[in-house]
């Protein structure tokens, strides 16, 4: 049993009661909502005659269904417009702060909360979205929840949860040029598997994470769920505090007091973990998924695995993946032709991601016939990118420059694959049909790797383009 970890400290501080079931009734400090998983929750409140208990602790935005090209209202998709109107009405009726399109702060929920300073160390955070684990980058305990749990948080500001074990994932050393945070988390998932984290919270530690920016840490924590973990986190440190300082919702008058408290909730040096796994950063290369789960990844310069050489539990899904993806065991992904390139999402739609991709795009051109587009994670990211001229770099290279939203990460808006198209994507999931076509294929990779694919027309080792 873990002891003295950040997870234990934050859990204990937010425990309201131990329920007869053995679960913990946990107070939720910050609740994030969007247009997809909240309408039914609000409807259930209305049926029971309930109000939102602490509306000031809930923040709303619209992201999943918004078009990224033409955002004029009403939306062309009537269902999307209906969901949009429902969120607007519910927020107005319950006094919930809503960052709507055109507010200057709208965007993907897991991008805007950190950039506003809403996400802070020691918090418990919930959202009706799988990738709520993103906020763990700040030393928060953040859970993705379902619609009925969204209702529970709105009504009571609590959740009934079973306490998780804690696995420490330690990565040490400096990353090689061309290797990014996305490669780190894909490497971890391919090594441990997509089910290894079930029942665990992942603590990401070691010198590699200490050297990362907050945006890089968010990329890693974002995909904790892809490794089976309910949440993932990094202990708060000077990097965390520097990011938060002077942000809109960060403490203003009692900064020193807040910083001292944040430091106190970090895992103790002698903390006891349920499990510890150690990686060497030198072993991590640019990584690309080849199959239909995020765990089916490979270093870009390595041959695809032979199913018979995989553990018995992975052989059937490997065979299924090869058939679906139309790839051959033993071959390399290098040179695989790409139809669509997508840079964005809550995993990789932040300013540092766009800078990394722009570095590759600058002075080059998207291959004719290939569709490539960049979707900033928020209106603030878009404004910053345009202030730096990144939009001009992308457009000069032949990329489309879009409005903020979840876009092609998932098939809930007009940005979708067609037929058997294969995409190079900076998003987080490569399931069958994830990007809108029942037969479409997705290769997950870093934004820089996506940009490299766009200007070469095929899976390319980004290290070959850096510095040229």
Curated annotation (Swiss-Prot):
Q: Which cofactor does it need?
A: [4Fe-4S] cluster
PANTHER family cross-referenced by the UniProt entry: 3-ISOPROPYLMALATE DEHYDRATASE, HOMOACONITASE, MITOCHONDRIAL-RELATED
Residues at which [4Fe-4S] cluster binds = 346, 406, 409
Q: Does the keyword Zinc-finger apply?
A: no
Q: Could you give a GO molecular-function term held by this entry?
A: 3-isopropylmalate dehydratase activity
**Enzyme Commission number(s) from the entry:** 4.2.1.33
**In which pathway does this enzyme or protein participate?**
Amino-acid biosynthesis; L-leucine biosynthesis; L-leucine from 3-methyl-2-oxobutanoate: step 2/4
What's the subunit arrangement here?
A: Heterodimer of LeuC and LeuD.
Which BP terms does GO give this entry?
L-leucine biosynthetic process
Does the keyword section mention Transmembrane helix? no
Q: Which UniProt keywords apply?
A: 4Fe-4S, Amino-acid biosynthesis, Branched-chain amino acid biosynthesis, Iron, Iron-sulfur, Leucine biosynthesis, Lyase, Metal-binding
NCBIfam families recorded: leuC (TIGR00170), PRK05478.1 (NF004016), PRK12466.1 (NF009116)
- Family affiliation: Belongs to the aconitase/IPM isomerase family. LeuC type 1 subfamily.
> Per its UniProt record, what Pfam families does this chain match?
Aconitase
Q: Which reaction does it catalyse?
A: (2R,3S)-3-isopropylmalate = (2S)-2-isopropylmalate
Please give the Gene3D superfamilies that the UniProt record associates with this protein: Aconitase, domain 3
Give the taxonomic lineage as stored in the record.
Answer: Bacteria, Bacillati, Cyanobacteriota, Cyanophyceae, Gomontiellales
What is known about what this protein does?
A: Catalyzes the isomerization between 2-isopropylmalate and 3-isopropylmalate, via the formation of 2-isopropylmaleate.
What is the UniProt remark on how the cofactor binds and its stoichiometry?
Answer: Binds 1 [4Fe-4S] cluster per subunit.
- Family annotation (HAMAP family): LeuC_type1
Q: What is this protein called?
A: 3-isopropylmalate dehydratase large subunit
Q: Which domain of life is it from?
A: Bacteria
């Amino acid at each position: 049993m873990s002891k003295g970890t950040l997870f234990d400290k934050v859990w204990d501080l937010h425990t309201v009661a131990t329920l007869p079931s053995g679960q913990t009734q946990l107070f939720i400090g910050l609740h994030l909502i969007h247009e997809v998983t909240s309408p039914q929750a609000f409807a259930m409140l209305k049926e029971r005659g309930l109000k939102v208990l602490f509306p000031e602790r809930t923040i709303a935005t619209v992201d999943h269904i918004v078009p990224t090209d033409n955002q004029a209202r009403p939306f062309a998709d009537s269902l999307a417009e209906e969901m949009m109107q429902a969120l607007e009405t519910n927020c107005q009726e319950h006094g919930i702060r809503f960052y709507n399109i055109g507010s200057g702060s709208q965007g993907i929920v897991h991008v805007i909360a950190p950039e506003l300073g809403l996400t802070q160390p020691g918090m418990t955070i919930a959202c009706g979205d799988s990738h709520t684990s993103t906020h763990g980058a700040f030393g928060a305990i953040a859970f993705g929840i379902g619609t009925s749990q969204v209702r529970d948080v709105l009504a009571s500001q609590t959740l009934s949860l079973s306490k998780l074990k804690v696995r420490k994932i330690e990565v040490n050393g400096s990353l090689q040029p061309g290797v990014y945070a996305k490669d780190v988390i894909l490497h971890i998932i391919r090594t441990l598997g997509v089910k290894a984290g079930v029942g665990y919270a992942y603590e990401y530690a070691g010198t590699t994470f200490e050297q990362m920016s907050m945006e890089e840490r968010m990329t890693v924590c974002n995909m904790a769920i892809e490794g089976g973990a309910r949440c993932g986190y990094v202990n708060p440190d000077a990097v965390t505090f520097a990011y938060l300082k002077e942000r809109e919702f960060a403490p203003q008058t009692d900064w020193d007091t807040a910083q001292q408290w944040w430091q106190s909730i970090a895992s103790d040096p002698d903390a006891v973990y349920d499990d510890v796994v150690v990686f060497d950063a030198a072993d991590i290369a640019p990584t690309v998924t080849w199959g239909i789960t995020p765990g089916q990844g490979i270093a870009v310069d390595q041959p695809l695995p032979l199913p018979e050489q995989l553990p018995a539990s992975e052989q059937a899904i490997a065979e299924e993946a090869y058939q679906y993806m139309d790839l051959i065991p033993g071959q390399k992904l290098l040179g695989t032709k790409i139809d669509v390139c997508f840079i964005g999402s809550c995993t990789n739609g932040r300013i540092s991601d766009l800078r990394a991709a722009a570095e590759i795009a600058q002075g080059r051109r998207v291959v004719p016939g290939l569709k490539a587009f960049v979707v900033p994670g928020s209106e603030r990211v878009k404004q910053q990118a345009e202030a730096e001229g990144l939009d001009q770099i992308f457009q000069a290279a032949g990329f489309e420059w879009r409005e903020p939203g979840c876009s092609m990460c998932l098939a809930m808006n007009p940005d979708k694959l067609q037929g058997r198209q294969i995409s190079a994507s900076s998003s987080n999931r490569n399931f069958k049909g994830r990007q809108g076509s029942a037969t479409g294929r997705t290769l997950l990779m870093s934004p820089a790797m996506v940009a490299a694919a766009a200007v070469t027309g095929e899976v390319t080792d980004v290290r070959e383009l850096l510095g040229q």
